[in-house]
Amino acid sequence: LMSVCMSLCCNGFQTATSKLVAEKPQNRQTILICAIIMSATIALLLTIIMYSNANYISLCILSEPRCTELVKALSFSILPAAIHSCINGYYYGLKKAAVPAATQLIEQTARIGSCYLIYAILSDGGSCFKPVYSIYGIVAGEASATVFSVITIKKDFSYFKISAKSLKTTAYGMAALFIPLSLNYILASFSSSVENVLIPRTLKLYGLSPALALDIFGTISGLTLPVLLFPGVLCSCACVMLLPSVSEANAAGKDTK
């Protein structure tokens, strides 16, 4: 569910921002502002839809009524994720990968630390760790990453002025890249989401209880699949780092480079 939302408002904009900034570094501020406005608008709509339809999503899509609270909490992570994804794309386009790397480190640290703090504060004696605590951790991690990204990029906008005409022109160029990229990400995420929904359902048809089916699915998705897909992560990282160089060479007409 989260991957589909990220495909709609984050991944496509991050890649488009990286490409456009690499091609036109002189217009980088306008490109980023345009990306954030468009991405944040979609993210806000998704947040409203997810929160208001959390019960339907839990019952009809996830087939687990206990996920209602989780879906509502998770909806608040979409907007900050969209904002710092655009900023990450901005720095990738400038070939400054240190900032996105630091952002991810801060996000993971805040996520784990906030989970521990929330459990320590809200747990009643020896009560078990509730799944919603991990969702609160995701929200805290995304918010922390966004705050760090905004503080870091603030210096690049000290003497910047934007015009409606340049913003409109950039929006058309952004849309031309964002739409096909997002469709590609959506198809991939949708396929993955269908798989994630079908695995627990199939396990329940096999005879397992809903709790045990989710337990086994958590083991598969959290332990097994990351190990199997690790080589693909390396290829994805290489693609992210190569995109600005390819875009810059293409804009300069250096096709052989």
Give the positions of each predicted feature.
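Helix-loop interface residues and adjacent transmembrane-helix termini in multi-pass membrane transporters
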Residues: 64, 93-94, 128
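Hydrophobic alpha-helical transmembrane segments
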Residues: 103-117, 125-155
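Alpha-helical transmembrane segments of multi-pass membrane proteins
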Residues: 64-86
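Interfacial transmembrane-helix starts/ends
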Residues: 27-41, 171, 175, 221, ...
